Amino acid sequence: MKHISYRTGNPALNSKAFASESNNRRGAEMLEVMTIKGTVDKTAMGLFLLVFSAYYTFSPDMTHFIPIGVIGGLIVAIITIFKKEWSPITVPIYAILEGLALGSISYIFNASYDGIVVQAIGLTIAILASLLLAYRSGIIKATENFKLGVFAATGGIFLLYLASFIMSFFGASISVLDPTNSSLMSIGISIFIVVIASANLVIDFDFIEEGAEKGAPKYMEWYSAFGLLVTLIWLYLEILKLLAKTRNR
């Protein structure tokens, strides 16, 4: 989301996923296998469900859906990671729940910064398209060193998120993560996070390609789509925060 040691910053996507799932399909030669086209189709379906539910909650009266979407999405994500064969059921549910949260969050940002949501969506699509083109043309390759670097950076970022979450219980926060903080350091950190989130897309592409090459079970199309959705949601939210910071300068 050819490689003996696979690393990715996305916890949902790693080589162990394919190793275990390939073992599961041994002796079941008639089982349909994962394809790139199938994964693209599943990703498109997931994005449709996400956008549809986000559109529904893009309203000032729907902010109560944020905790429902965030907590529900987290629970379903954990289930999906440990029960990959359930992906055809859990991933659509995950997309809907995340959409409920994203719609309300997007409305809050757009109410403060008019047009910011359209800009964030446009940038997310542009980054996805350009990186996919660069990956397919061989300009960018997911080498082992690349994966290791992205994995380390992603781990550091999520430790920062975790520290900020824990500090919030004590009335404190990490100011550079605040979207209202328009300092150069805060903007610089946001740019770094957007770059790392974007780099995770390259690893996701590699994961999908590897799964198709190894003949992973058909349900891994949904699981791979799940990993890509996780990265795209993260990237979109970070772009929203970055744009908000630049608007405050």
PLM features per residue range, with description:
Residues 1-249:
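A hydrophobic alpha-helical transmembrane-helix feature that marks the membrane cores
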